Amino acid sequence: MKQVSDASFEEDVLKADGPNXVDFWAEWCGPCRQXAPALEELATALGDKVTVAKINIDENPQTPSKYGVRGIPTLMIFKDGQVAATKIGALPKTKLFEWVEASV
């Protein structure tokens, strides 16, 4: 899973080939930590269809502000430099996989 920052977001996500699922998270967020293993599995299982990235909102406040992230965890699918889908809140693994597969 790729770690991105405010400085690398444009290059790593917006200009990337193929879709990206970006997890907006924070160290202090319990639901974020709970879902991390499912995101790791997603990155491995669907790595040929989507790149999974994480951005820590405390260390990188500009990007979540730009995309209107109000609660975490927030997952966004980016395609061709645009937000294609957004999901706020933790999802069970099966729902996460279904949502990402339907969105990419």
UniProtKB/Swiss-Prot annotation:
Residues 2-104 form the Thioredoxin domain. The keyword Glycoprotein does not apply. It holds the Pfam family Thioredoxin. Keywords: Disulfide bond, Electron transport, Redox-active center, Transport. Disulfide bonds join C29-C32. It comes from the Bacteria. One of its GO terms (cellular component) is cytosol. GO terms for molecular function: protein-disulfide reductase activity. Participates in various redox reactions through the reversible oxidation of its active center dithiol to a disulfide and catalyzes dithiol-disulfide exchange reactions. Belongs to the thioredoxin family. NCBIfam families: thioredoxin. This is Thioredoxin. The gene is trxA.
